[in-house]
UniProtKB/Swiss-Prot annotation:
It is an enzyme of class 2 (transferase). K(+) binds at E43. The lineage of its organism: Bacteria, Pseudomonadati, Pseudomonadota, Alphaproteobacteria, Rickettsiales. InterPro entries: ADOMET_SYNTHASE_CS (IPR022631), S-AdoMet_synt_C (IPR022630), S-AdoMet_synt_central (IPR022629), S-AdoMet_synt_N (IPR022628), S-AdoMet_synthetase (IPR002133), S-AdoMet_synthetase_sfam (IPR022636). Its main location: cytoplasm. GO terms for cellular component: cytoplasm. This is S-adenosylmethionine synthase. ATP binds at H15, D164, A165, K166, R230, F231, D239, R245, K246, K266. Pathway: Amino-acid biosynthesis; S-adenosyl-L-methionine biosynthesis; S-adenosyl-L-methionine from L-methionine: step 1/1.
């Protein structure tokens, strides 16, 4: 048993990197809506007054990429020229090419069971019993803070809030269990006229306290609100944004390993996305069944080959079974070939934009099929 502190961060939908992720997934969604078999690897770069969309896309449908980009930027909240970045007047440049035929030959024109992996890849999935969503507590609560900030901004409850924001939550663990929140860092972009003391009070009383469990807050919990003292200039005016630069925010907040591949902008034949969802699905059902308190799954693939190269389950000594026995159960009951993952998790009919902010895992929306606990009986019978 260990005693330690652990920190995870989240960022808002108005953070530059998250703008890029959401645009990439908005393009993906628009293509899959009309062409479920479209091949998409869409990357986005945002900076002051400019959005550049590039990548490899093969589809039989037409997508007005410029309009998709502008609509998404407005939806996020950059709809005022005074913010320095505005969906109505920023430049939008598109540089799209077709998917390489060398890659396509491994995944196209194959029956569902024989669709090969689009690249060599290793992915990880994780679950633990720290929260009701079976996610690590630090990232779970960091995401909730960002959701609350966006809600108060969009509902005009705190009219001085602006889209860019970040949160960071540190929890103290005893015997591997979270017992108290040690500190909360929250930085939010704001109107230039709001006073710092009013901002700090509002963030603590309207964002932090209604969001975080009272039993985890205590008199010594530290609140660090806009520590630099001013955060007026934000979004792409302050920092460039790129698709795939928040992969730890997107996954488990650093509590679990990461294979390195990002998720957003990729159709489900890209196994760094679809197989990572599958790995989470397996890990969550293992923990949800009560078989283990913590579980991390690794799956690896070779390009053009359907079946995984390797599968490994690590339960950190919290399972009734050995890691070898758990891995054997997984390979017996879960089909991890790309085509079967796509079919079983309904990955051709998703709204991927929903995943592009506030994390890909631990969500309650029915759209997140990899969060279902419909395989727990496999492990409960052990």
């Amino acid at each position: 048993m260990e005693n330690f502190v652990f920190t995870s961060e989240s960022v808002s939908e108005g953070h530059p990197d998250k703008i890029a992720d959401q645009i990439s997934d908005a393009v993906l969604d628009e293509i899959l809506k009309h062409d479920p078999n479209g091949r998409v690897a869409c990357e986005t770069f945002v900076t002051t007054g400019l959005v550049l969309v590039g990548g490899e896309i093969t589809t039989n449908t037409y997508v007005d990429i410029e309009q998709v980009v502008r609509n998404k930027i407005h939806e996020i909240g950059y709809n005022n020229p005074s913010y320095g970045f505005d969906g109505s007047c920023c430049a939008v440049i598109s540089s799209i090419v077709k998917q390489s035929p060398d890659i396509a030959m491994g995944i196209d024109n194959a029956n569902e069971e024989e669709i090969g992996a689009g690249d060599q890849e290793m992915v990880f999935g994780y679950a633990c019993n720290e929260t009701k969503s079976l996610m690590p507590a630090p990232i779970y609560y960091a995401h909730l803070l960002m959701k609350r900030q966006a809600y108060l901004r969009k509902q005009n409850i705190l009219s001085w809030l602006r889209p860019d924001a970040k949160s960071q939550v540190t929890l103290r663990y005893e015997n591997n269990k979270p017992i108290v929140i040690d500190s909360v860092v929250l930085s939010t972009q704001h109107h230039p006229e709001i006073q710092q003391k009013d901002l700090i009070e509002a963030v603590i009383e309207e964002i932090i306290k209604p969001t975080l469990p009272t039993h985890l807050l205590h008199k010594d919990t530290k609140y660090l609100i806009n520590p630099t003292g001013r955060f007026v200039i934000g979004g792409p005016v302050a920092d460039c944004g790129l698709t795939g630069r928040k992969i730890i925010v997107d996954s488990y907040g650093g509590m679990a390993k990461h294979g390195g591949g990002c998720f957003s902008g990729k159709d489900p034949t890209k196994i760094d996305r679809s197989a990572a969802y599958m790995a989470r699905y397996i890990a969550k059902n293992i923990v949800g069944s009560g078989l283990a308190d913590r579980c991390e799954i690794q799956i690896s693939y070779a390009i053009g080959v359907a079946s995984p190269v390797s599968v490994y389950a690590e339960t950190f000594g919290t399972s009734k079974l050995s890691n070898e026995q758990t891995t054997k159960l997984i390979t017996e009951h879960f089909d991890m070939r790309p085509g079967k993952i796509i079919k079983n998790l309904k990955l051709h009919t998703q709204c991927y934009q929903k995943t592009a902010s506030y994390g890909h895992f631990g969500r309650e929306d029915e759209n997140f099929t990899w969060e279902q606990l419909d395989k727990v009986d496999i492990f409960k019978s052990i």
